[in-house]
Amino acid sequence: MGAVLKIPPPFSLILTCGKDVTMGKYVLKRLVYIVIVFFIISFLMYALYNLIPTDPARAQLEPMRPQLKPDEYFRMYEQLRKEMGLDDHLVIRYARWMGIIKGLKGEFDGLLQGNFGYSQTFKKPVVQQITEPMKNTIFINIFATIAALGITLPLGVYCAVHKGKKFDTTVQTMSILGYSLPIFIISLIFMYFFVVRWGIFPLMGSKTPNASYEPGSWAEFVDKLYHIALPVIVMTFASLGGMTRYVRSSMIEALGTDYIRTARAKGLREKVVIYSHAWRNALLPIITSILAWFLGIFGGSVIIENTFSLNGMGKLYWTGLNTLDFELVLAIQMFYTAVSLIGSLLIDLSYGIVDPRVRVDK
């Protein structure tokens, strides 16, 4: 028998600490990259929106124009542009908007300090305006994500195990159909049956008009859940095709590997082979889509929210674009940029957790 090398406790502790240090260095390096990329994207977005011919000072004074004389209007207009710093260089305005340099009031009051700007459309700070739509978007997407994952993961695994059977063929046909149809077509079909024909769900809105509930009450929760049920069903159905096919293909690839054939040759039970061996190895490519779905909880769907008149982030973003409210649009864009950058780091780290063969530091 060969001698077994045993690592003394102090040395094993050093190796463990070394692994933790390597992980810490990797995370620190990625965080530095995230900060650099965030500043680059923020500057490009700010410069892009400033190329669009809009004038916040003119938009703010326009309602007062009929009551003002031309010379008085022009004088107020020039003064307001100076107060808003619109005549300064693009780089200066960007640095002021980000909070890198002091603002016009002599204070650091930008994006880095939590000041997301002022919405000219809604006449309130952007932070106050996005609070309610963000709550609605998260509320809807949590249910849609849980429902979609709860269906697609077991369905994809079952279709892979029973590849070529009638059930698998039927699911693949329906998946292609659902994947090919635009989501607004799916919305209209579901609205016709569930609202017009059967009258099960309300047509639009996120709560009953003129209904008075105490904030956070059970009645408010049930009413909101009733109103978002149809949008959640539409979002779930629209996402079934792509994710089911992705899970199925990953499982089929895993089931065709040599170690699965070896496990079956050893006489292991089929459930052990599928769920303990094949599923764990098939999970690595799937985890990207799963985490992307969870990160998408914060992102609103422009089409769904406009179709069903839901007060969410997607509809708010669309309103900001239509009304040229670029401080609102930029704030939403920067939030999604930060979520995407942090999400990419979480996806990379999750690879090392799911598959120990992956070297995170590489």
Q: What are the roles of these predicted feature ranges?
A:
Residues 38, 42, 46-54, 59, ...:
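Membrane-embedded alpha-helical segments of multi-pass transporters/permeases
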Residues 34, 133, 137, 173-180, ...:
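Residue-level signal for discrete positions within transmembrane alpha-helices
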Residues 47-51, 174-204, 234-240:
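Membrane-water interface segments at the C-terminal ends of transmembrane alpha-helices
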Residues 24-25, 134-138, 143, 147-167, ...:
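Alpha-helical transmembrane segments of integral membrane proteins
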Residues 38-95, 198-220:
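Hydrophobic alpha-helical transmembrane segments of membrane transport/permease proteins
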Residues 85-153:
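An internal, D/E-rich "acidic patch" concept
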Residues 20-35, 265-266:
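N-terminal Sec/SRP start-transfer signal
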Residues 1-15, 20:
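Positively charged N-terminal leader segments that act as targeting/secretion signals
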